[in-house]
């Protein structure tokens, strides 16, 4: 009854106004699943490949009609008649059909759209919410959000070199309370920025993008906002960074163009260690460049016992790169982005590998998002304990928070908010 009978796909717009792929899957019993695919601004060189049309006369070359066509024809021909409940077989069939190591022929955007829509259709056929269908009865941990309230780097037009400054409501008792706490800090920060004469326009992910001179200036504003909102920094609300260091790694050094400084690999490690010592920073993502394995190892050895070090561009949700990191003792956490690897099966495999090795996993959005809230369900399904899905503004970000609120309500007394237990390093402090 769960045989796949039809796939329809279309070109829709993401939160930046760029085209992306949306896929509908229909099963033999009439069950329906729909998924929309996100897109990143700062992308790792080792990510699976989005298929873009390259026709400069449409969407400045960013159209996705080729991926749409692939989903509706070649992929449908390959998986039509297969059981949607056999997710692994469906995903493996698409990967084999593509035949490239990075999904470049059919496009990770086509394959992922179908993969997620198949899972949603199978969940509907089983009468279960997606988080329960994917995670079983064990999926009940609501993640601590990483809320991106100041944007810099590739996500904003300002001098700040780091891409994201985030708050984590580790002291909340529930997901709903965590969202409330984050919202209160967000609005308090807005008032303080405005009072100081800064603009309060928001970046791609809903955070503010003020013209501040340095990371320290941004962190000071965030600390002030946390206190002014009535919370204790480091206790109620911890800090997290996404440096996106690959974006400013040039000629073997880290070029802080906004600050007018260049730091060697060793100086970059020392700088991040200094920030962790000065502020209640419990997580740093991409503190070193994606192929600076030596720098990553230095950073891990220096502060990995007291700070979560998240590999995004480093690992790109890829089990081969993650296995190298585990073997070398590099980083201690992986960012999970479904479109970096391009299928649900491979995404779940990366989470499983990380958790078995004692690494944490952070479920994540992309800067180019849609109203699709699948990652909220996946965060609960995998019990990963952390989610990164933007600020407390823009409906494309709030769709995920709102879905988590619904999931928490649906779980009732079974729901468990991860809190400080989500970060091993925080428990040691």
Swiss-Prot record:
Binding-site list for (2R)-2-phosphoglycerate: 163, 337, 366-367, 388
Main location: cytoplasm
Gene Ontology cellular-component annotations: cell surface; extracellular region; phosphopyruvate hydratase complex
Coiled-coil region list: none
Catalytic activity annotation: (2R)-2-phosphoglycerate = phosphoenolpyruvate + H2O
UniProt xrefs under CDD domains: enolase
Record flagged with keyword Magnesium: yes
Entry-linked Pfam families: Enolase_C, Enolase_N
Record-level GO BP terms: glycolytic process
Annotated HAMAP family: Enolase
Protein keywords: Cytoplasm, Glycolysis, Lyase, Magnesium, Metal-binding, Secreted
Family matches, as Gene3D superfamilies: Enolase-like C-terminal domain (3.20.20.120), Enolase-like, N-terminal domain (3.30.390.10)
Compartments, as annotated in UniProt: Cytoplasm; Secreted; Cell surface
Molecular functions per Gene Ontology: magnesium ion binding; phosphopyruvate hydratase activity
Keyword Ribosomal protein recorded: no
The EC number(s) this enzyme carries: 4.2.1.11
Name of this chain's protein: Enolase
Names of required cofactors: Mg(2+)
Function: Catalyzes the reversible conversion of 2-phosphoglycerate (2-PG) into phosphoenolpyruvate (PEP). It is essential for the degradation of carbohydrates via glycolysis.
């Amino acid at each position: 009854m769960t045989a796949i009978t039809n796939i329809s796909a279309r070109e829709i717009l993401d939160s930046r106004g760029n085209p992306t792929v949306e896929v509908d899957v229909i099963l033999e019993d009439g069950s329906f699943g729909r998924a929309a695919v996100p897109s990143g601004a700062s992308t790792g060189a080792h990510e699976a490949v989005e298929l873009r049309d390259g026709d400069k006369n449409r969407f400045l070359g960013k159209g996705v009609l080729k991926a749409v066509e692939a989903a509706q024809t070649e992929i449908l021909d390959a998986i039509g008649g297969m059981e949607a409940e056999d997710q692994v077989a469906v995903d493996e069939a698409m990967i084999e059909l593509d035949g490239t190591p990075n999904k470049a022929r059919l496009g990770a955007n086509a394959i992922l759209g179908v993969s997620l829509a198949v899972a949603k259709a199978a969940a509907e056929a089983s009468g279960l919410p997606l988080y329960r269908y994917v995670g079983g009865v064990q999926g009940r941990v609501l993640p601590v959000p990483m809320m991106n309230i100041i944007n810099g780097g590739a996500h904003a037009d300002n001098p700040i070199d780091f891409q994201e400054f985030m708050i984590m409501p580790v002291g909340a008792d529930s997901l709903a309370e965590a969202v409330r706490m984050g919202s209160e800090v967000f609005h308090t920060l807005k008032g303080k920025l405005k009072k100081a004469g800064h603009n309060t326009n928001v970046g791609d992910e809903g955070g503010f993008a003020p013209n501040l001179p340095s990371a320290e200036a941004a962190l000071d504003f965030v600390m002030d906002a946390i206190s002014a909102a009535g919370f204790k920094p480091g206790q109620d609300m911890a800090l997290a960074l996404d440096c996106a260091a690959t974006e400013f790694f040039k000629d073997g050094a880290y070029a802080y163009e906004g600050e007018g400084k260049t730091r060697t690999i060793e100086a970059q490690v020392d700088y991040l260690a200094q920030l962790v010592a000065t502020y209640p920073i419990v997580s740093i993502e991409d503190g070193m460049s994606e192929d600076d394995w030596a720098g990553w190892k230095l950073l891990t050895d220096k502060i990995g016992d007291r700070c979560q070090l998240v590999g995004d561009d480093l690992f790109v949700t890829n089990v081969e790169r993650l296995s190298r990191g585990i073997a070398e003792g590099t980083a201690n956490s992986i960012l999970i982005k479904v479109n970096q690897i391009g299928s649900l099966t491979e995404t779940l495999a990366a989470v499983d590998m990380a958790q078995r090795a004692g690494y944490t996993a952070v479920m994540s959005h992309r800067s180019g998002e849609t109203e699709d809230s699948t990652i909220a369900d996946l965060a609960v399904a995998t019990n990963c304990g952390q989610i990164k899905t933007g600020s407390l503004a823009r409906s494309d970000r709030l769709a995920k928070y709102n879905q988590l609120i619904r999931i928490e309500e649906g779980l009732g007394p079974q729901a468990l908010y991860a809190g400080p237990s989500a970060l091993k390093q925080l428990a040691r402090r």
